[in-house]
Amino acid sequence: MRAEIAETPVPLSFAAADKGILPDRMIAALAQAGGILSEVAFVPGQVQPASLDLRLGSVAFRVRASFLPGPRTTVAERIDELKLHEVDLTDGAVLETGCVYIVPLLESLALPGDIAAAANPKSSTGRLDVFTRVIADKTRGFDSIRAGYHGPLYAEISPKTFPILVREGSRLSQIRFRRGHAILDADALSALHAIERLVDADDADFDGGISVGVDLAGPDPLPLSDGEGWGGGLIGYRAKRHTGVVDVERRGGYDVRDFWEPMFARADGTLILDPDEFYILASKEAVQVPPGYAAEMVPFDPLMGEFRVHYAGFFDPGFGYAGAGGRGSRAVLEVRSREVPFIIEHGQIVGRLVYERMIARPDTLYGTGIGSNYQAQGLKLSKHFKV
């Protein structure tokens, strides 16, 4: 049964040994206890297996530049310094590419001293090449909310490829709550893999998380006429420029051909990423997240500046899991090249999937009864496009 947020306050307490990510029912209890506040009522489906969807407020501020408030300044104070104009989101408005907007969120926090939080774009947001991060008052980092934080939350939004139509209540980001440290090290990850087979690779590397490579062969590679190598399979999509607007609430409303160019495998198993272009690719490996765990995709090498992989990094309990309707799912990779052309090769490691324990198994798993868009996925665009 899906956890929803009731109006009656309930106590939220933990044993000393309770470390990890809060599941859906504990997120609901945290809200009921006053740890998560909202200007308007919470809505059905807002609580996910290991996260809470965050909703945009009624106004967006276009600002001159992205910023962090720093340890002594609030976000509102920085908005006053950098604001160009306001955009009313009540009935919907278009956020243009190349612009930076700050939107106060409907949710705010009054966290207990032992609970911290982390935010990330939702999958559909990242697949639209919408760069979004959550900011809290008096902080030095994006998407990171310190334990015990009391205050508002804001979304920084910068559409990179497609202009987007958003409105009050649109959900572009999600937030996880955690108590203590429960990330699995290489030994614990290897032991879990021996039981659950987390990845369909015989030579899986667990150092720093499960290594994830890029698939440049495609699901149905075609043999070449000379009998060597492979080629021809669909490996991904490259975003088109100067397209129409994408309404973030419109599911299956857009023709893929109007927004994306399909890309097919090359015989040499390489792909040249063009500067400042956006690609949707898939992982070579199929992965799964068992019910008692959550995962996050992190960069393989944060110092590698040639391209960025995966805006939206959260993987919920049950992702790709056989008991939740999956058969192992491939991670969809949102890839943006930077200043120079860069060649990537089939199987090249582009990220690592870091696993973390849940404090308890969620009531609802990804893919079971929550309308999950990407369970048992292969290469897949966001839910906005009909295929």
Show which residues each predicted segment covers.
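DUTPase catalytic domain/fold
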Residues: M1-V387
